[in-house]
């Protein structure tokens, strides 16, 4: 019942499966296999969340990951269909760098970072991943970078200045 209610509350979310991994636990009688799934969901207009689910079967792991992603959504201040300013993010051994791009550039990003940017609603961006390319760490680093991005309006409000003073 909870699954049906969650889908009815947010029917317009884009969902992407990034990775499925088989893991094993060694016990006295042999190995027990289970699966992990990494997913991202977003509304294409600045809301994004990621989830990591574990279960004995692949569909159950994906479903758990999607539910966690819907619960852990953040808002991102976008500038049209690109970023406000260049941002860096870091998680564990992964570092990501993203900067806004002009109209028509597209999403220049690889793997896990591309999926996060697509569901967020970013259409023009240049990005690079340094260090570890582990999908979980890259997704966390990308989301932390997007979370730390501020619009000129929010910076002006915090500092008590006008927007043209912030932009120079």
Swiss-Prot record:
Q: Name one GO cellular component term.
A: small ribosomal subunit
Q: Which UniProt keywords apply?
A: Ribonucleoprotein, Ribosomal protein, RNA-binding, rRNA-binding
Under the heading PROSITE patterns, the entry gives: RIBOSOMAL_S5 (PS00585), S5_DSRBD (PS50881)
Q: Which InterPro entries match?
A: Ribosomal_Su5_D2-typ_SF, Ribosomal_uS5, Ribosomal_uS5_bac-type, Ribosomal_uS5_C, Ribosomal_uS5_N, Ribosomal_uS5_N_CS, Ribsml_uS5_D2-typ_fold_subgr
GO MF terms held by the record: rRNA binding; structural constituent of ribosome
The S5 DRBM domain, residue ranges: 13-76
Looking at the keywords, is Ribosomal protein present? yes
Q: Does the keyword RNA-binding apply?
A: yes
- Please provide the Gene Ontology terms (biological process) for this protein: translation
Gene3D superfamilies for this protein? 3.30.160.20, 3.30.230.10
Q: Which domain of life is it from?
A: Bacteria
Record remark: domains? The N-terminal domain interacts with the head of the 30S subunit; the C-terminal domain interacts with the body and contacts protein S4. The interaction surface between S4 and S5 is involved in control of translational fidelity.
Describe its partners and assembly state. Part of the 30S ribosomal subunit. Contacts proteins S4 and S8.
Q: Which family does it belong to?
A: Belongs to the universal ribosomal protein uS5 family.
Q: What does this protein do?
A: With S4 and S12 plays an important role in translational accuracy. Located at the back of the 30S subunit body where it stabilizes the conformation of the head with respect to the body.
The name this protein carries in UniProt is: Small ribosomal subunit protein uS5
Q: Report which gene this protein is encoded by.
A: rpsE
